[in-house]
């Protein structure tokens, strides 16, 4: 779990996710993500984002999915924010991978 109070997630911390099995939980305070959520990796990763307002992606094209080449990552967001995430810039490019947190079974 990423500690509460973190507002900015730096580039490169999730670039290779080989074999990650535990969920990564971002706090409600997260505002920006630099780079991709996940980039390459043969293991799945579940990401839980508690932020009600979808964090803004910095440093990637608005035409590029934040998952890059990783199609095994699933992102769980607050149920009440699901629609916001599915239409937000960049997030909308990975809509099949965004789920309400109430569906998370981990």
Where are these regions (language model features)?
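Acidic, glycine/polar-enriched metal-coordinating patches/loops
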Residues: 59-69, 81, 88-92, 106
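Short loop/helix-cap segments at secondary-structure boundaries that form the rim of catalytic
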Residues: 39, 86-89
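Alpha-helical elements of the RecA-like P-loop NTPase motor core of helicases
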Residues: 35, 83-86
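C-terminal capping region of solenoid repeat domains
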Residues: 94-106
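Structural signature of tandem-repeat unit edges
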Residues: 1-8, 17-32, 41-57, 70-81, ...
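A structural signal for alpha-helix termini and helix-coil/disorder junctions
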Residues: 15-16, 91
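Consensus positions within tandem repeat domains that build extended binding/scaffold surfaces
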Residues: 11-14, 35-37, 65
């Amino acid at each position: 779990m990423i500690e509460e109070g973190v507002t900015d997630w730096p580039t490169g911390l999730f670039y290779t996710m080989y074999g990650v099995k535990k969920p990564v939980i971002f706090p409600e305070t997260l505002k920006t993500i630099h780079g991709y959520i996940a980039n390459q990796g043969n293991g799945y990763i579940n990401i839980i984002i508690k932020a009600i307002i979808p964090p803004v992606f910095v440093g990637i094209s608005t035409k590029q999915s934040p998952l890059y080449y990783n199609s095994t990552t699933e992102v769980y967001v607050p149920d009440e924010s699901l629609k916001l995430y599915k239409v937000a810039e960049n997030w909308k490019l990975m809509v099949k991978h965004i789920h309400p947190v109430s569906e998370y079974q981990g």
